Each structure stands twice: as structure tokens, then as C-alpha cells.
Amino acid sequence: MQTSYKNKKVTVIGLGKTGLSCVDFLLAKQADVRVIDTRTQPAGAEQLAKNVPLHTGSLNQQWLLESDLIIISPGLAVKTPEIQTALAAGIEVIGDIELFCREAKKPIIAITGSNGKSTVTSLVAHMVNAAGLKVGMGGNIGIPALSLLEQAHDMYVLELSSFQLETTYSLKATSATVLNISEDHMNRYVDLEDYRQAKLKIYHHAQTAVINAEDALTAMDGLKNGVSFGEDNADYWLKTEKGRSYLMAKDERVLACDEMKLVGRHNYMNALAAIALAQAAGIPLESIRRALREFNGLDHRFQLAHFAHGVRWVNDSKATNVGSTVAALTGLQLNGTLHLLLGGDGKGADFSELASLINQPNIICYCFGQDGEQLAALSPRSQRFSTMEEAINALRPTLSAGDMVLLSPACASLDQFSSFEQRGDEFTRLAKLS
């Protein structure tokens, strides 16, 4: 469904990579484009074409009301009063993913979830590539979706956030999944159900819905085209035979888990979801197997950062919410003590789910950052520090062979770092001093 934007007054809210991709797309379609960014010095302003008007520091209500169409950044809530005023005036408000879906002609595999979505997106793209198809991977990971339209692709694999899905209506995915749902972005949503409903939009018009059999929140009433993944009682499941675990597609053995470079139960679940998505999109099993063997995983996601003196230092800085840390801790094999680094900005989440997992005699918690106090209250074996560096300096002398130091903070990083990547890099730097 291609739409004409010629001479339409379109206001793009939010610059950065995604905003610029919207501007470039709309200019190529001969739209009359204006840009608003609530920041006084927005990233990407210097790359904006000089003939495009830019308003910074606030939402320009007059510009919004003069628009035929508003393209909203996923970072800005639709509930914002100025946006509600525009909607009440009958002005359409959509996001960059909706623009993309109206234009894309090739099959789309769509992935969302509170945790694991970047890993699954990258793994599925690897599977599509292994089948000899030209894959366009983007959305909430790497390249903005609209930028993918600049080159020819056979298939698109998109990671989508709840924020992006809120303003997407025309997505008709070949296969789609909500990997899991746990509290995240509670500072943006009324409650968990509000957040869940945003995620479930990914299933609307999908040919195949891939559902987590272990997470009832990922299921949607009335779905007739679903397949499931989970440890057991699912279409895609784990089979254990003679001490080895195997990834299964219904009755067919896909691969032994120990043949993958990905480790940990949560990654076996990610692999099962990826197999289901790829098979539903027609990717041959042999290509899927090859991709599973080759895939190295992603940085800052349960990544071995350093190994010295028998101690493993594991960087899981991408664990920016409780569910992600729960996934890292579930089924974790330990020989010695786990030194767990927790803390940062909890985004209003309820941390209580962690309590039963971390209240173990072989787990010591080192809590830091904005919500460190709240996290330290979960376990009597917790210590409180201002920064991650202070915590690491305190735990370093206590380490013994067989121990693991795990950064899986259950929080966003922005209280003390520019990004989860910077936090992970700093952890790795400190680990290598050992």
C-alpha cells in the first residue's frame, strides 16, 4: 500500500537517526517537511537539509495543527497533550515503522518482547542470509527501517519496540513474535496490561504468530494461526536425551544445544523462537542449522568479557529490566560464588521478582546507582555502593577460582552512563585489570 506524500505538510517529531531517515524518505516523496525536536540541541541537526524548517526546545502546537500528517518519534508518548490536541483535530499521527510498512513490498519477520529481541532478530537475519536471500535487518536495532528501502532486499527482519508498535497499523508480518513480557517502561505505561497491549499489536494481520508457551502474557485471544516455543508442551521445544539437550521443531531434531556458540537456557529459548519464525517464512532447515552453528551472539548480552585465575567475568549490560536479569539467573550453572552487579535507573519497575533468585547462599549482590538502595533491600547478602567501579574494587579481593562476576543490572544505565554499551565497556575494562 503505497501512499502519495507529494505536497503534503508533514511534521517529523524527533531527529536522531530515525528522524533523519523519515525526513530523507519524505523529501524524496516531495512532501513539505518540517521538523520539531523538544531538545534544544538535538542530535542530527547538523545533518538536516538546510531548506527544512527546524523548531527546537518545545512542541510547536501551531506547526502540529497545520500538518496533514505527523510522524512521531518512538521516544515521545502519544499521550502527550500537544499530540492529543492534534489527534482531536483529526490529524493522523504515525511512526516510522508505519511509513515503512506502507511502502515495503517484500515479506517481513517482526520481533518484539521485553528481552532477547535483538538476539533473536540478529539470529533470524543470519538464517535468512544463510538461505542465500538478501536480508534487510533494522527497526529498533542498527539501521532505521526506512533506510532499508534504499537497497533491494528479499526479506526484512525487524526488531520492534512497544513504542514503535503503538503507532503502527499496516504491519502484515509473514511471521511475528512477542518473545516474553515483563515489567519495563512502567514510567510510560499505565500498567503492565497497557504495555502488553502495545506489544500484542505485532500479531495483527500476521500470517503466523509465534507464542511463548511459558509466558501466558504473550498469547492473544482469538489467534488461529499460532505456533509455540518452550521447554516442553510446545511446537518448538527442548528434548533431553543421554545428558544432551536438542532443539526440536515438532518431531524433527534441529541441532544439539552444545553445537551452538550461544549458551544458557534463555538463549535456547531464543533459538527456538528464531527457528519457528524462520520456518514460518519458508527458510529451509539446513540454512537454519548452519546459522545456529555460526551465530556468535551479541555484545553486552551474557558475553564472556574476561577469564582469569579461574574467574569468569560476564557482561550482560543489556539487561536493562528485571525480566532480562531473571532470564540470566534462571538455570545458571555455578561452581563457586556469583558476584552479581545490580543497579542503575529501574524506570519505576517492581524488583521483587528478583528476591527469590538472589536469596541464595552462593550469591552476593553489589548494588549501585540511582536505585541501588531498593535493590540492596532484596537480599541480606547485599552491599551498597555509589558506582559500579567502587563495587568491582570491593569484590575483586574476595574472588576465588570457580566464581563468576556478572553484570546483569536489571536497570537502565542513563543515571551514570551514556548507554548500556558504555556501561558494558567500562565493566570489561575493569574486568581486564584482574
From Swiss-Prot:
Catalytic activity: UDP-N-acetyl-alpha-D-muramoyl-L-alanine + D-glutamate + ATP = UDP-N-acetyl-alpha-D-muramoyl-L-alanyl-D-glutamate + ADP + phosphate + H(+)
Superkingdom field: Bacteria
Keywords associated with the record: ATP-binding, Cell cycle, Cell division, Cell shape, Cell wall biogenesis/degradation, Cytoplasm, Ligase, Nucleotide-binding, Peptidoglycan synthesis
SUPFAM superfamilies: MurCD N-terminal domain (SSF51984), MurD-like peptide ligases, catalytic domain (SSF53623), MurD-like peptide ligases, peptide-binding domain (SSF53244)
Keyword check for Ligase: yes
Record field: transmembrane: none
Biological or metabolic pathway of the protein: Cell wall biogenesis; peptidoglycan biosynthesis
GO CC annotations on file: cytoplasm
Claim: Plastid is one of the keywords in the record: no
Residues that bind ATP: 113-119
Compartments, record wording: Cytoplasm
EC id: 6.3.2.9
GO aspect biological process, one term: cell division
GO molecular function: ATP binding; UDP-N-acetylmuramoylalanine-D-glutamate ligase activity
Function: Cell wall formation. Catalyzes the addition of glutamate to the nucleotide precursor UDP-N-acetylmuramoyl-L-alanine (UMA).
Family stated for the protein in its record: Belongs to the MurCDEF family.
Protein name: UDP-N-acetylmuramoylalanine--D-glutamate ligase
Organism name: Pasteurella multocida (strain Pm70)
